[in-house]
Amino acid sequence: MSTIIDGKAIAAKLRAEIATEVKILKEKGIIPGLATVLVGEDPASEVYVRMKGNACQELGMHSVKHTLPATTTEAELLALVARLNSDPTIHGILVQLPLPKQINSDTILEAISPVKDVDGFHPYNVGRLMVGKPTFQPCTPYGVMVMLREAGVDLAGKEVVVVGRSNIVGKPVALMCLQQHATVTICHSKTRDLPSKVKEADVVIAAVGVPEMIKGEWIKEGAVVIDVGVNRVGEKKLVGDVEFAAASQRASAITPVPGGVGPMTITMLLYNTLEAAKKTGEGNR
């Protein structure tokens, strides 16, 4: 049986450390501030934004939520982003995706000041990540890397297979693994013979959004499995991208769904916001 890499426990430990640092900043008159922007009424997005706001308040951060109608124009959203960019009480700006079809997501993400881009999606920060410079790292991949570190996994020389090539998870997590001296293979919908690729992996990172696509029998004995997927099956059941029951018989360590990578994503957002506040140093007094 595998060791379970408990995302909730790792996130709780990190949040306690963040809360301590927030207190220290507050003594200097700086309150880390996060602005979340939600356009429209997507139920899942509403839940995510609420969770982010609650998490901020729990750790003593300043949180502002902007909810705009689904009919909002790109120009109106850009105007809000510009105001937040110039607001000294806001250190991090998060525009919840997806956006309505009349708004170009890339245009909005590029309008966010790179020093407030706590999601790590601005091309400037993506470029810095690419060349290994200090930057805001995208929250989910960052969470994955912290979990691997906390689980005692040394990636140097390891065969890492990333299944999924999104800009949000697949590509950045592959880069981060490369920076830790892993040999990285990225698999996707056009990959030939996916099972044979996965079977070679010392570490599998699954981020495709297809329920239990990665079969347990594909996992090499003793491999580490990080399952980023969260897929709803039926009314209430949540499953990952990996066939958990079968994979956990072969893996040395595995993340569960729920309770694995999910709790880490918001925690790393809070960490990035804290770091942004430290850098700007002005704050909400």
Curated annotation (Swiss-Prot):
Task: State if Oxidoreductase is listed as a keyword.
Answer: yes
Entry EC number(s): 1.5.1.5, 3.5.4.9
The reactions it catalyses are: (6R)-5,10-methylene-5,6,7,8-tetrahydrofolate + NADP(+) = (6R)-5,10-methenyltetrahydrofolate + NADPH; (6R)-5,10-methenyltetrahydrofolate + H2O = (6R)-10-formyltetrahydrofolate + H(+)
- Give any single GO term for biological process: methionine biosynthetic process
What does the entry list under GO cellular component? cytosol
Q: Which InterPro entries match?
A: Aminoacid_DH-like_N_sf, NAD(P)-bd_dom_sf, THF_DH/CycHdrlase, THF_DH/CycHdrlase_cat_dom, THF_DH/CycHdrlase_CS, THF_DH/CycHdrlase_NAD-bd_dom
| Keyword annotations from UniProtKB, A to Z | Amino-acid biosynthesis, Histidine biosynthesis, Hydrolase, Methionine biosynthesis, Multifunctional enzyme, NADP, One-carbon metabolism, Oxidoreductase, Purine biosynthesis
Q: Name one Pfam family in it.
A: THF_DHG_CYH
Q: Can you tell which superkingdom this protein's organism belongs to?
A: Bacteria
Q: Pathway it acts in?
A: One-carbon metabolism; tetrahydrofolate interconversion
What GO molecular-function term can you cite, just one? methylenetetrahydrofolate dehydrogenase (NADP+) activity
The subunit field of the Swiss-Prot or TrEMBL record says: Homodimer.
According to its UniProt record, which protein family does this protein belong to? Belongs to the tetrahydrofolate dehydrogenase/cyclohydrolase family.
PANTHER family associated with the record: C-1-TETRAHYDROFOLATE SYNTHASE, CYTOPLASMIC (PTHR48099:SF5), C-1-TETRAHYDROFOLATE SYNTHASE, CYTOPLASMIC-RELATED (PTHR48099)
Q: What is this protein called?
A: Bifunctional protein FolD 2
Supply the source organism's classification.
Bacteria, Pseudomonadati, Thermodesulfobacteriota, Desulfuromonadia, Geobacterales
Identify the gene encoding this protein.
folD2
